[in-house]
């Protein structure tokens, strides 16, 4: 159950924000500001409290579709659109912050970026991140989107762009639509295949990451010396 922190009595959320800053407000108060109004029978703070109590974490709010938002009592079409826009804006701010650091320093850094990009996609997406000698991103490219006939990309598709971009290294990332990030036998076989192909061309495969909505698996972190 989501934990609610009660607001300070005597001050409305907007007044608290003006006097003390947004960072001191509870999630309930911030949500109440976004919702703006309640209903005839329920205050906006009470509505925000009820919505949050129905969630296991604040992240659940970002996963609700427009239709699911509208099914929440008191949340009509306009409020659901405003909430969806707020969530999308928050995602884009997070992505912009991550993008400021052009140099890739860790698998976790890439995983955070890619969980936002493809972690909740209903189809499998395979993304290649091409890097220069300083591990700076040259280009991030979606190489493959899963379909009925195929569920994984071929190394040649990934390495074609690596050669074209003159990348010295790359990171391969794909999502599991199930949300689970543990590798399947096919994932392991594919990683072996792409690693051999990279070695043949003198390109370093820095990692293969599998991401879900809120978790990831790194072949480099989980397998000693990246030996598969």
Curated annotation (Swiss-Prot):
<dbReference type="GO" id="GO:0006508">
    <property type="term" value="P:proteolysis"/>
</dbReference>
<comment type="similarity">
    <text>Belongs to the UPF0758 family.</text>
</comment>
<dbReference type="InterPro" id="IPR020891">
    <property type="entry name" value="UPF0758_CS"/>
</dbReference>
<protein>
    <recommendedName>
        <fullName>UPF0758 protein str1465</fullName>
    </recommendedName>
</protein>
<dbReference type="Pfam" id="PF04002">
    <property type="entry name" value="RadC"/>
</dbReference>
<dbReference type="InterPro" id="IPR046778">
    <property type="entry name" value="UPF0758_N"/>
</dbReference>
<feature type="domain" description="MPN">
    <location>
        <begin position="103"/>
        <end position="225"/>
    </location>
</feature>
<dbReference type="GO" id="GO:0008237">
    <property type="term" value="F:metallopeptidase activity"/>
</dbReference>
<keyword id="KW-0482">Metalloprotease</keyword>
<keyword id="KW-0479">Metal-binding</keyword>
<feature type="binding site">
    <location>
        <position position="174"/>
    </location>
    <ligand>
        <name>Zn(2+)</name>
    </ligand>
</feature>
<keyword id="KW-0862">Zinc</keyword>
<feature type="binding site">
    <location>
        <position position="176"/>
    </location>
    <ligand>
        <name>Zn(2+)</name>
    </ligand>
</feature>
<feature type="binding site">
    <location>
        <position position="187"/>
    </location>
    <ligand>
        <name>Zn(2+)</name>
    </ligand>
</feature>
<dbReference type="InterPro" id="IPR025657">
    <property type="entry name" value="RadC_JAB"/>
</dbReference>
<keyword id="KW-0645">Protease</keyword>
<dbReference type="GO" id="GO:0046872">
    <property type="term" value="F:metal ion binding"/>
</dbReference>
<dbReference type="InterPro" id="IPR037518">
    <property type="entry name" value="MPN"/>
</dbReference>
<dbReference type="InterPro" id="IPR001405">
    <property type="entry name" value="UPF0758"/>
</dbReference>
<dbReference type="InterPro" id="IPR010994">
    <property type="entry name" value="RuvA_2-like"/>
</dbReference>
<feature type="short sequence motif" description="JAMM motif">
    <location>
        <begin position="174"/>
        <end position="187"/>
    </location>
</feature>
<dbReference type="Pfam" id="PF20582">
    <property type="entry name" value="UPF0758_N"/>
</dbReference>
<keyword id="KW-0378">Hydrolase</keyword>
């Amino acid at each position: 159950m989501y934990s609610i922190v009660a607001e300070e009595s005597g001050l409305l959320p907007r007044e608290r924000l003006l006097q003390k800053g947004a960072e001191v407000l509870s999630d309930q108060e911030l949500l109440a500001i976004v919702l703006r109004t309640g209903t005839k029978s329920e205050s906006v703070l009470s509505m925000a409290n009820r919505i949050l109590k129905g969630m296991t974490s604040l992240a659940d709010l970002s996963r609700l579709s427009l239709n699911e938002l509208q099914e929440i009592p008191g949340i009509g079409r306009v409020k659901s659109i405003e909430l969806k826009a707020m969530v999308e804006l928050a995602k884009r701010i997070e992505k912009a912050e991550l993008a400021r650091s052009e140099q890739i320093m860790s698998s976790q850094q890439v995983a955070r970026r890619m969980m936002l990009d493809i972690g909740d996609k209903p189809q499998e997406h395979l993304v290649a991140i091409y890097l220069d000698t300083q591990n700076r991103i040259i280009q991030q490219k979606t190489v493959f989107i899963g379909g009925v006939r195929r569920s994984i990309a071929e190394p040649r598709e990934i390495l074609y762009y690596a050669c074209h971009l003159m990348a010295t290294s790359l990171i391969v990332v794909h999502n599991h639509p199930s949300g689970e990030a543990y590798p399947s036998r096919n994932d392991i076989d594919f990683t072996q295949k792409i690693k051999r192909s990279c070695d043949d061309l003198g390109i370093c495969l820095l990692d293969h990451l599998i991401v879900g909505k809120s978790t990831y698996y790194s072949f480099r972190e989980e397998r000693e010396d990246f030996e598969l």
